[in-house]
Amino acid sequence: MHTYQTLTLAEANLILDAAQAKAEALGVPEVLCVADNAGYPVALRRLDGGKVTSVQIAMNKAFTAACHRKPTHMYKNALPGEEAFGIFTQHEGRFTVFVGGFPVLVEGQVVGAIAASGGSGEQDTEVCQAGIDALVRHLGKK
């Protein structure tokens, strides 16, 4: 039998606080989602000016990163003409290959994911990394 850990609401909010601060520093109106280890949202924030359409995209990025245990941009083989093209039609269309979804690992185990939608791929990545870094610092202090 396996025991799985997942992010708590407090940890999700810690991640989102740091990600939001980074998004605001970049001047990007992001939608941010932290999911549990099963890909379901624990916490979601739509920053002022964040696009309504980015809400579902952020949730899908978090789902993909948590459930498939890889950053969403690692699925380039799902683009047209590639081996895994069409995988995005699975899981009710929730699988996504857009940049900006990252698994959150603790001691090598995926405990959840963070995703950002609303900026460029580079901005989304920076915002997510700020959230992950905040959790790492927090856990290091325990």
Language model features with spans:
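Flexible, solvent-exposed loop/hinge segments and secondary-structure transition points
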Residues: 1-142
